[in-house]
Amino acid sequence: MSDTILRTSATAVPDTALLDQSLLGATAGDWLALLKPRVLYLVVYTGAAGLLVAPGGINPILGFTAILCIAMAAGAAGAINMWYDRDIDAVMRRTAGRPIPTGRISPDGALAYGVALSALSVLLMWLATNLLAAGLLAASIGFYVFIYTMWLKRRTPQNIVIGGAAGAFPPVIGWAAATGHVGLLPVLLFAIIFFWTPPHFWALSLFASADYQKAGVPMLPVVAGQKATRLAVMRYTLWLVPLSLLPYVLHLAGPVYGASAMVLGLAFVWYSWRVLRDRQDGNGVSLTRDAPAKAAFKFSILYLFLIFGALVLDHLV
């Protein structure tokens, strides 16, 4: 791992001139990019699902505010992540075009933006819904920033496994915003996202391993190799499928969800099997330019959209 990268300071003394320059020179698109909008879609979607399936319902305006707070919090955490990871983002092809490495936004501007949005999202959630939802929202930000970004990401190949908890909070927060408590169903939804995260990100890391290695990030393919990563993708997918059926088995969801979870789960297993059986050279490197891994990565996103959509549909019918 590059000593230069690891020694790069993530806590530089604020430069007022740079901060002013970033505030004046950056476009709205640059500030939006700091929020990682591609990630926000799934966060908002799963948070809304948790809110919609919660018993009792919620005032539409308060519900919209709760989802907005979840989106703001996720975006804020993403901005702080980009601030802290600006050194490795600069050397990875996939992230080199982000606003901080390109100089469109200063590190201090990004940090101030992320902290302000974090505080605003938690305060607004508290005022609009309840203290539990606000506390869970704050915990999700803290987990992503301090546990995943600052502690795990550069230290262990299990960064995605443990850090996946940060992305699993939204349906729990949505449920808590509507009810003021946490039940068994949102806990199961948390677990589904938690076990979905490793095969999703490890599929990505299989075809982006050179980037991670260059940046010194110990993703599983970099540390354990391609073969071990392919096996891990399959293993977590096999754990995910029976777990995803528990809401139906425990009578927390109906047949629409149960049938959807089974079909989608079998499809996910098939995509993971293709990753496992991808043609490789003697070092486990794909001979197909990681086509199965790319397909599995794309399907994993569709999987989460569809299974949570089935849950909401089941609740409505």
UniProtKB/Swiss-Prot annotation:
- The answer to keyword Transport applying to this record is no
The way this protein sits in the membrane is described as: Multi-pass membrane protein
GO:BP terms for this protein? heme O biosynthetic process
Q: Does Membrane appear among the keywords? A: yes
Keywords on record: Cell inner membrane, Cell membrane, Heme biosynthesis, Membrane, Transferase, Transmembrane, Transmembrane helix
Similarity comment text for this entry:
Belongs to the UbiA prenyltransferase family. Protoheme IX farnesyltransferase subfamily.
Question: Which named protein is this?
Answer: Protoheme IX farnesyltransferase
